[in-house]
């Protein structure tokens, strides 16, 4: 590895004077769906699933409420995201899993992919917390089973 490139933890220590914000969104995480296509006469149009649109609108309201009065972040950003997902019954009903579910330490190793959750959240944050999700230069993302579904977000400016 190139010694000149800062690692995630080193950058955290050096850049601590920049703004950092935290959000806890009490909403069940949803993955971004693929665009849908429809043929209308000789034209093909794209459209978005209604469920993800409604979810994103609700998520934007929650973000706007918690982020009210703050200006949009500028420059490069570092994100730490935790998606807490309701476990399926075959996990939640097993007695030996109860404490692990309470501790929120069981990682989700099933579909949907983590980047689809991330994309849906970043799209909801764009225009409220930051101008564009392209500003996110570093990220630490995890998805875990929890009896309290939610999304926890930490965003930190690492340059401006």
Please provide the spans of the model-predicted regions.
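Acidic, proline/glycine-enriched N-terminal capping motif
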Residues: 2-160
């Amino acid at each position: 590895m190139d010694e000149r490139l800062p690692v995630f933890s080193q950058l955290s220590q050096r850049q601590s004077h920049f703004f950092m914000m935290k959000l806890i969104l009490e909403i069940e995480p949803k993955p971004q769906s693929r665009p849908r296509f429809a043929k209308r006469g000789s034209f093909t149009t794209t459209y978005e699933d209604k469920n993800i649109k409604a979810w994103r609108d609700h998520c934007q309201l929650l973000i706007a409420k918690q982020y009210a009065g703050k200006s949009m972040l500028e420059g490069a950003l570092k994100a730490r995201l935790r998606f807490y997902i309701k476990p399926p019954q075959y996990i939640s009903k097993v007695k030996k899993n109860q404490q692990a579910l309470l501790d929120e330490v069981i990682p989700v190793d099933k579909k949907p992919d983590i980047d689809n959750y991330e994309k849906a959240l970043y799209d909801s944050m764009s225009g409220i917390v930051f101008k564009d999700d392209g500003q996110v230069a570093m990220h630490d993302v995890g998805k875990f089973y929890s009896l309290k579904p939610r999304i926890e977000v930490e965003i930190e400016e690492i340059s401006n």
